[in-house]
Each structure stands twice: as structure tokens, then as C-alpha cells.
Amino acid sequence: MRKLVIILATALIAAVSAGAQTETALREGWKFAFGNAADPAKDFGCGTEYFNYLTKANSIHSEGPYSAKFNDSAWQDVTVPHDWATTLPYAPQASHSHGYKTVGWKYPETSVGWYRLKIDLSKADKSRHYALRFDGIFRSATVWFNGYYMGTEPSGYAVQTYDITPYINYSADNLLCVRADASLEEGWFYEGAGIYRSVWLVETGKVHPTQGGIYTEWTDGVLIVRAETANDSSEETEAKVAFRLLTKDGAEVAKGTDQVDLLPGETATAEAAFTIAKPHLWDISDPYLYTLETTICGDTYRTPVGIRTAEFNAAEGFRLNGRKVTLKGVNLHQDHAGVGAAIPDGLIEWRVKQLQKIGVNAIRCSHNPATPALLDICDRLGVVIIDENRLMGINAEHKRLLENMVRWGRQHPSVVLWSIGNEEWGLENDPRGALVARQMQDYVHLLDPTRQTTLANAGGGVMFREADVKGYNYIRQNDVENRHAQHPEWIAYGSEETTGCGTRGVYFPEPGRMPSINRTGTPENVIERGWQYYRDNPWTGGVFFWTGIDYRGEPNPLSYPSHDSEFGILDYCGFPKDEAFYLKAAWTREPVLHILPHWNLSGHEGEAVQVWVYSNCDEVQLSANGKNLGRKKMPEGGHLSWEAKYKPGKLVATGYIKGKKVLTETIQTTGPAVKAVASTETVGDITIVN
């Protein structure tokens, strides 16, 4: 039976109030239209006016979309997050890596998108500070507010914040206008197009913490709390900053104060130190979060705090709170069936929970900085994160983007490692690459001295020597065993390893589909080989499989009209493939028994079929159409196999632990579907129907 995931928006406007700070999600009321990347006349004349937005500070001389007098009545109504690429057709000439969607430099007419939003600020307090925060726009985003040019962010993955306080209309509508240009790709995977992450209206006091400016550091029983404080008032200010650490129940654990003297426009950092004898530690099994109350000039801001230690070393791999933890991880791109890159927060949480069900405790954000929502969710759910930089380099632009990632991630206990790059083939064997890596690593340590850095290596032997922690992309590419023998002091983990997955439910070759490599591939390129290696070598930190969930783009080894990668452990809708049960058996204590393939093999009657079982039972017995095929001992981290001639009917597997029957799994040949059965699950602001 086919299953369908339907995502329904149930809340389009949300406000998150944190004491004096209010963050309002700007979700509904947006207008959208395509511009044009090659023809200014079809791009609403943007930038071609006699006085354009770069020559004069306001668009009063323009009739373009950033002008209040512009008529957008013919534009589409959309909600944000929004990925316009999902609505575009496919074409064989389009980008293979981006899933053959007609977006990119070949398609100027569908690669620029314009957004307009009217915001009512008639009740805004003139004594307060207001900013707009965009968690991510793909890409090359230009922002105007009430006709004033706010700025341009070329990266599709950077959080961008603009002070709008001086430009507010308190007696009329306020116009927010955004132009996004997705002509160029930043990655080699589907990236979407448009305002694909959340947009926030942020209200604070005039003297306030900077965005991402409240952060903590736990070292040797002492919690250092810091608040980078900005003075956006017109007066010199003696800013009194008070900190209180509270339990989940609101009990005060510690408190302290500091003062920073700030001239108008100046920024300084207040801090305090709390000695905490027996903190409740944040852990993957108990993701406990304190609350830090920071009061600045009478305004209070609340920040989640997770206290924990995390380190990688050469002897034990990864240690969390002083004990060895094996990272059971997956790589993850940010896109999903139906919504593309514009994943609502509730769906992000649902995806993480589906992965946790099979034992996943770690996610590598491949290959770009995570959306802030994912970090918040993993803080709450107890999943550790490797946050990854998009583009290696050491000039001002590269460092700005690197700092953006670190500032937004350093307060999250889920983040345990900063990745400065991935498979940089042009640098991996070049001494210049080593210099770049060293300078990037030093800069990260300056911004965050509490975490190590990593580099995901495709096989080169020069650049990745500089990384604190060596990330091996595939055992077969990196000669891991010999490198460990030569350099036992190196700290290492599997940053990528193959899942060997294919199209869910496909077991024989057919056009546009990919049977699992695990049943047809070489022993060096299957999921069992990857897990067994990292399980049996405790000096490694664990492994991150490629990938946790199918994603659009990179349909290798297939090509058009196939458009998504099928190496995910879960398919594009989040349904588990056979390999999900293999990992669940290996990674959890819950008894697992799973038979493959399915038993609807029309056209293969009378053929010998290899029937596999994934399980963590001690022994499994299999019968086919009532015939006992035998009872076998289950190899740890492996599979069992029986040969059965296909005949419509029934397969029954029985699992035994310590000689006692604990599980029975039955699959059988089915006829045509007679009805559709749907169930719903609501997570946050979305409902999933399957």
C-alpha cells in the first residue's frame, strides 16, 4: 500500500515572547512574483531607475516593488517559509545535482523571486528597538523596508538581521520587500529558492543583547555567562546586567551582576561566573535545559542553557559528560517531500523523531550551517550536532560567514563539533589547503574555545592533518586502518559512510528505480561494513551514514527523469526502508524483527529468492508457506539469509531471545487495495497524514 504525507499548516502566525524580548514569526500575508535574472524590464526595473536604491536612501523615485505605491494585487499569496522551486516543472537540461528543477542560470525567468509584506506597527512602542531577522533566504537576498535599502546577503545559509527602528511608520502600513536570486548554486544538492526559513520581527529595549550575543561556557565546575550588549539609544548608558540561572521548575540556582558603560552605538560584553557543584547535565538520554534570565536595564531575556562536557580524543573517540558515547549518526540535507527546502519547524521535529526511533543520536548538517530551528529542536530532544561551514576560505567574506555559524550555534548544547569544510578536492593534497584549514580553525577557536573543529576528508593526505578531529568520508576512500596505524594520536570518526540504500520496496532492476546496493554491492560498500568497522574500533567517535533521509537532487547513479537521491535510510516522505530496521536492531535495545523483500513478487514465480532478516534477537526461525526453512543464530550487526522459491503466500519469522520466543513477523502476498486508511500526527504547527 502506498503511503502519503500531507503537510497542513495549522498556525500561520506565531509569537515567542522571552521576557522583554518578543519574536514574532512573519508567516502569512506575503505576496510573491517572479522577476527575471537577465532582463531588468521583466525584473520590475530593479536597479535601473535614474536614482536607484544604491544612489539614494529611499525609493521615492522608483515605482518598483520596494515602493509603497507599487500595485501587487496580481501577485500570488504565499506563506513563509516558502520554496518557489517546488512549484517549477522538471526538465532534462536542468541541473542534475539540484533535481532537474527549472531554476538556476539557465532559467532566468524563474530564478528571481520577489516578496512583499505589509506589517502593521501602529501599536509599536517608540521607545523600543525593532529588528528583522531572516533565518535563511536562497539566495543573494536584497532587503528593503519602507523603501529603504537594508542590505544584501549573498549566502543562502546565513542568518541576517536588520535594524528597522529608524524607518518605522507608526501611523501607516510598513512595507517589507525582498528580492532573492537563485541563479547560482552554493551546493551540489537541492537548495530550494526563496525565503525558505523563518522570518522574525524582534522587539527589544534600546539597550539590548545582540542577536546570538547571550552565551555560556562550562569549564571545571564553573559556568561563565556572557551578554554582548549593544547601545542603540542616543545616550551614553551605564547598563546594569543581572544574570539568574533557573531550573526547569523556576528555582534559582545562581545569580550575578555586571555593568558595562556604553556610548551610543557601542557594544560591550557583560559576564558573570557561577560555581555549580552538582549541575543537572544535558545528555542525549536526558536533555535537561536550565533557563538563563538576563536583565539589561530592566528588560529580561530568557535563554535555554544546557550544561555538559563534550570532547573527542584519540583513545575513546567521543566523550559526553566524561563517558564514552558512540555517535550513531546520519548526514542530513534540509528538504522534504512536498515542501522542498521550506520545512516547517514541526516537520523538522518530526524528521528528527523518526530518526531517533531507529537509534540515531547525532546529525551532521550536510553541507551548510543548520537552521536555528534544528538546533533548538536537537537541544530539546537530545541529539548531538556537527554544524558545518559551507565554503572554505580565509578572506573577510569567508570569516564573516564562519562567524555567523558559530555565533548562532555556540549556545546550543547539541552542537559538539564545528566542521570547517567537506571534500575540498582542490585543497586536500595542497599545502595551501593546510594553511587555509589552520587559519579557519584558529578563527573558530577564537570565537568558541570550548569546541573542537573537524574536516570531512575525501581521501587527501595534507589539509585534514590540521583539523582537531579527522572526519573520514568512506572507509574505502581514506585507508583508515593504515592511517590509524601510522598516526594513533589522530582523533577520528566516520563523517560519511554508505547506507547502501535504494528505492524503498524495489528489489529487482527496473527503469528509474535503484535496488538496494546492500543486496547487490561489494562487501566494502554496504551498511553492515560501515557500522561493524566503527563499532569494533573504539578509538573512533562513531559514524554518520549517508544519508538519514532521501533528498531531492543527486539521483546518482540514475538520471532524468529520476530527480532525488535514494541513499536515505528513510525515504523522501520519512517512511523507513529495510536498512532502517538494520540500524534499529543494531542501535537500540528494542527487539527488532524485519523480513525482506516483500512477498508481492509477481513475475518471479518459481524463482529462488534470497530472504533476509534483520534482527537483534539471538536466533530467528523462518517459514515459507508453512514450510520450516530452519532456525539460525543471528550474527551481531549482520543479517540472516534463507533461500525460498517465490510462490504467493506467506513468510513468517520468529525471533528468540535466550531460547524464548519474543517476536513474530509476518509478510504475505496481497491483492488489489480495497480502501485507503489514513492516520494523523500533529507536531508543533503541522499535521502529518499517512
Task: Spell out what each predicted region is.
Residues 671-689:
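Beta-strand-rich domain onsets/edges
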Residues 171, 220, 263-267, 606, ...:
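Solvent-exposed, conformationally flexible loop/turn segments
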Residues 34, 44-64, 69, 148, ...:
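Extended substrate-binding grooves/exosites of carbohydrate-active enzymes
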Residues 19-96, 175-181, 248, 528-531, ...:
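Accessory carbohydrate-binding/adhesion or oligomerization-edge regions at the termini
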